[in-house]
């Protein structure tokens, strides 16, 4: 078992009272699983991801990664935000290396490997202002995976990109997953994206966020969004929103 999320609940305290954001979340991921999480806005998807990342330790329950209880960020978790969050004063290769020294041959070789995997050859010495948003997000992906984390956490990483760039980065991510078999949890509002990428789809209900349904995705790779089997699964997911009363909030 790579990741175990056990009885996780989360509350926020405001002047008007206590607000429960997550309620008794339980699910497990084996090594190499690719799970997408979808649900109404405000259901706690991003909050759950931050808890798994160790960025929020004020919650009930526990997160176990590779047998270790998680209370803070570590090399076990890689995190990719919607914004690339690159350092503007560092080059592409320096951003990928982050706090590691490129003078170290092992680090330099690892950075070179990831530059090739995310198809940024020739842009190693470029600065963030000199590359596109899609390329910047590829740098963020490489940076998050450089240390070989047990799980990669992605919080709507392609949400701000145009359709063409988004589609391209989906292929880049799938290529990485197929090569490395990194366990991934990917939050998205896009049902097609959820189906296209993952082998399991976690549907969350509105606040307080609970797991409404987990749907196994057995479509073979590479997937065709226009195929009958893809559309049938899409209908199945949509029915969960409609019949489960989740459609009241935008997804």
From Swiss-Prot:
It is found in: Cell membrane. GO terms for cellular component: plasma membrane. It comes from the Bacteria. The keyword Nucleotide-binding applies. Keywords: ATP-binding, Cell membrane, Membrane, Nucleotide-binding, Translocase, Transport. Pfam families: ABC_tran (PF00005). Its main location: membrane. It catalyses: ATP + H2O + aliphatic sulfonate-[sulfonate-binding protein]Side 1 = ADP + phosphate + aliphatic sulfonateSide 2 + [sulfonate-binding protein]Side 1. This is Aliphatic sulfonates import ATP-binding protein SsuB. The lineage of its organism: Bacteria, Bacillati, Bacillota, Bacilli, Bacillales. The gene is ssuB.
């Amino acid at each position: 078992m790579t990741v175990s999320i056990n009885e996780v609940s989360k509350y926020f305290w405001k002047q008007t009272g206590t607000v429960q954001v997550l309620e008794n979340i339980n699910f497990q991921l084996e090594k190499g699983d690719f799970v997408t999480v979808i649900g109404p806005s405000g259901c706690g998807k991003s909050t759950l991801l931050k808890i798994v990342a160790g960025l929020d330790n004020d919650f009930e329950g526990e997160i176990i990664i590779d047998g270790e209880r998680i209370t803070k960020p570590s090399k076990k978790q890689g995190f990719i935000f919607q914004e690339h969050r690159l350092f503007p004063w560092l080059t592409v290769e320096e951003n990928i290396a982050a706090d590691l020294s490129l003078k170290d041959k092992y680090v330099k070789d690892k950075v070179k490997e990831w530059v090739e995997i995310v198809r940024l050859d020739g842009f190693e010495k470029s600065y963030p202002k000199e590359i596109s948003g899609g390329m910047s997000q590829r740098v963020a992906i490489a940076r998050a995976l450089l240390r070989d984390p047990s799980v990669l956490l992605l919080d709507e990483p392609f949400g701000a990109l145009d359709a063409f760039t988004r589609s391209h980065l989906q292929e880049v991510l799938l290529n990485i997953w197929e090569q490395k078999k990194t366990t991934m949890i990917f939050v998205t509002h896009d049902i097609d994206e959820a189906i296209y990428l993952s082998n399991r789809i976690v549907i969350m209900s509105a606040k307080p966020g609970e797991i409404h349904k987990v749907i196994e995705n057995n479509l073979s790779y590479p997937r065709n969004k226009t195929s009958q089997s893809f559309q049938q699964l899409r209908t199945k997911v949509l029915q969960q929103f409609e019949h489960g009363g989740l459609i009241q909030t935008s997804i």
